[in-house]
Amino acid sequence: HYPLRRQRQMCIRDSFPNLSTGQIDVSTRIVNMDEGARADTNLEALAKLRPVFSPKGSVTAGNSSQTSDGAGALILVSEKILKQFNLTPLARFVSFAVRGVPPEIMGIGPKEAIPAALRAAGLKQDQMDWIELNEAFAAQALAVIQDLGLDPAKVNPMGGAIALGHPLGATGAIRSATVVHALRRKNLKYGMVTMCVGTGMGAAGIFERM
């Protein structure tokens, strides 16, 4: 229900446009929101889904991000280049950290990467005003939130990967853009992007609004 609620809030607030899309051998249709969140599901149906990785596991198709397409791009420059081309920055990239955990618990890599990024920036966790925690699976995102004591109100305020999709290779840029624009729109100071990576890695980066 959380992804669906976040998605509806976004559509109402930002007035998402209708886009015509075409697919090979499929008629054109109108798309005006992400397709991951399903309004026709319920807790009883979700509870009947089989675990994906382990017979007694908690990860199912119902609490995982969907296969999705997407693209994203960022421009990161030095202060020298900023001045040379008279550019106006949207944010400052404060720090970045990569850490790892045993592969069998790969989803909680951000648990180690977040404190490392905070140390590198000389900042405290409660100074983060907005946190984009990529939820490839709900279980790993919830584990990171619980273990680090993150404020749920600051985590994925506009919905995470289950609501909006997780296009491999683009998620980092998309989540970073989300943070930067949210900081500017809401006049906040610090934002963080963090995600798990296959084989146990975790990454986290901190942005400061300019």
Language-model features: locations:
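N-terminal extracellular/periplasmic Venus flytrap/periplasmic-binding protein-like
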Residues: 6-9, 13-81, 147, 152-154
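Flexible, glycine/charged-enriched surface loops at secondary-structure junctions
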Residues: 6-9, 86-90, 125-127, 152, ...
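Condensing-enzyme catalytic core mediating Claisen C-C bond formation in acyl metabolism
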Residues: 41-108, 112, 119, 177-178, ...
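Active-site pocket-lining segment
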Residues: 16-18, 94-163
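Cysteine-centered functional microenvironments
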Residues: 56-67, 97, 127-136, 155-171, ...
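Active-site-proximal alpha-helical scaffold in enzymes
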Residues: 6, 74-80, 145, 167-188, ...
